[in-house]
Amino acid sequence: MRTPITTHSLLLLLLLQQLLQPVQLQEVDTDFDSPDDEMEELEEYLEEFQSTGPTRPPTKENVERRVIIEPGMPLYDRDYCNEEIKRKNVYHKYRCVTEHYFLLMQYDELQKICYNRFVPCKNGVRKCNRSKGLVEGVYCNLTEAFEIPRCKYKSFYRRGYVLITCAWQNEIHKLIPHTINDLVEPPKHRSFLNEDGVFVIPP
């Protein structure tokens, strides 16, 4: 009578092993996935890429990834924009962006500009915030609009005052950079400050 019980026990153990095996494999696979931040970045990119609604509000991570650059590739390199825009996935849905700025500075320094005084800026935007000091960066201007990622840009090295717009982020209760409006090189013989101490862009 003991033999059937032993046989059934072995069969049950084998069945349990088969049932548990996929769960174990799934757990092992998860350990080899990309880091959480990379997966989140991919999900954000795909959501923005496929979205038909308005552009999502900026986040610190988004600005850091798309705007802030580290020392490395020479800023004077004529292919700088072509390489960096492709590497950082700087696109607007299915289209190439018409212009973009890369800034050689820390994000915290950029965020502090949001609390500087308002100044006029380009493209009809009334209020921008200006950096107090000069910043190095690269201005990218679209020259040939192919299907992404084959966008072609002309790169311009600049060292000037950063003009940005900012937006309030409820999650962190802070102003954060929204768009880089311009990187204005100072004129050689004229000041950007008028008699009242207001920053103005000369014609």
UniProtKB/Swiss-Prot annotation:
Glycosylation sites: N129, N141
Main location: secreted
Recorded superkingdom: Eukaryota
Keyword Nucleotide-binding: no
A Pfam family recorded for this sequence: RnaseA
SMART domains recorded: RNAse_Pc
Disulfide feature: C96-C151, C114-C166, C121-C128
Molecular function terms, GO-annotated: nucleic acid binding
Annotated compartments: Secreted
Assigned GO CC terms: extracellular region
SUPFAM superfamilies per record: RNase A-like
Keywords for the protein's UniProt record, in alphabetical order: Disulfide bond, Glycoprotein, Secreted, Signal
Signal peptide limits: 1-25
Membrane spanning residue stretches: none
A single GO BP: defense response to Gram-positive bacterium
Family, as annotated: Belongs to the pancreatic ribonuclease family.
Protein task: Does not exhibit any ribonuclease activity.
Protein name as it appears in the record: Inactive ribonuclease-like protein 9
Gene: RNASE9
